[in-house]
């Protein structure tokens, strides 16, 4: 864990500026990992997840009117933050917990979603590979179902077909 901060005041403390740089590495955090159906439950709790977090924060404040009956202070804040999943337990590279996907090397607040290309209007539109129609969890698609992109081309829609579309936490705020 590291933080470096500089603070300065100018013009008899009428303007105050502060900048902070930080870097943090959390080790052995708990997360859920999927287990086989034979276990009788969906997930187990495991330690060993590592996350890095780094960023910058800038604060500026000014006393526009200080020694008058009317006081006027102005403040400004801006920040940048980036987090990254460094490691998952049991040397896994990806895990899915409910509808949330965690992938090593990506941000923990990433949105991984299926790409929708429309709706099948009839059964003949559903792609067929080796005599089997495209499916999700073994259930074949039919007319009226959404058209999801089969990213990995294995004729099954699963967690490997989710694509990164954005993040829940904006990198810049202010």
What are these regions (language model features)?
Residues 1-174:
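Outer/extracellular conduits and scaffolds centered on Gram-negative outer-membrane beta-barrels
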